[in-house]
UniProtKB/Swiss-Prot annotation:
Binding site residues for substrate: D28, H106, Y128, A129, N130
Entry's localization field: Cytoplasm
Annotated InterPro entries: D-ribose_pyranase (IPR023064), RbsD-like_sf (IPR023750), RbsD_FucU (IPR007721)
Record-listed E.C. numbers: 5.4.99.62
Family of this protein: Belongs to the RbsD / FucU family. RbsD subfamily.
Active site as annotated: H20 (proton donor)
Protein source organism: Histophilus somni (strain 129Pt) (Haemophilus somnus)
Primary localisation category: cytoplasm
Pfam family, one: RbsD_FucU
Catalytic activity: beta-D-ribopyranose = beta-D-ribofuranose
Subunit structure, interactors included: Homodecamer.
Name of the molecule in the record: D-ribose pyranase
Keywords recorded for this protein, A-Z: Carbohydrate metabolism, Cytoplasm, Isomerase
Length: 139
């Protein structure tokens, strides 16, 4: 049995097989997922697991180069936005790189998310709690 934070075998496998610049989406319960993207549905009930909890577990195993979020999160969900930026700042320090955060319109976010290898669906019931994480390399 693994002793790291992430125990979900399928999610761990997807992170391990991401190539440089390939992406993974972590989303709330409402984001539409393209049929072309593999879905890992972690949602058990409203709020479980939460978006931020899921982000923290995923980034404990993933080397992140940059991220994309919807512009709307800043106004419609400032608490999640601020906590998300804090998590990414801490990750930047741990990794020794600068993780650029790009803001796009929500409609563009949905298009970009359809290009990801996998979507991790949470039980989050708050607006615009979605992020696309792009894989980097630790060298």
């Amino acid at each position: 049995m693994k002793k790291t934070k992430l125990l979900n075998a399928s999610l761990s496998h997807h992170i391990a097989t991401l190539g440089h610049t390939e992406s993974l989406v972590i989303c709330d319960a409402g984001l539409p997922i393209s049929n072309q993207v593999e879905r890992i549905d972690l949602a058990l009930e409203a709020g479980v697991p939460g978006f931020l909890q899921t982000v923290d577990v995923v980034i404990s195993e993933m080397f992140v180069e940059h991220a994309v979020v919807a512009k709307e999160i800043r106004e419609k969900n400032p608490q999640i936005h601020d906590a998300l930026l804090d998590s990414l700042r801490k990750l930047s320090e741990q990794q020794g790189n600068c993780i650029a955060v790009e803001y796009v319109e929500h409609e563009e976010f949905k298009v970009l998310s359809s290009e990801s290898k996998v979507a991790v669906c949470t039980g989050e019931f708050s607006p615009y709690a979605n992020i696309i994480l792009y894989s980097g390399v630790p060298f």
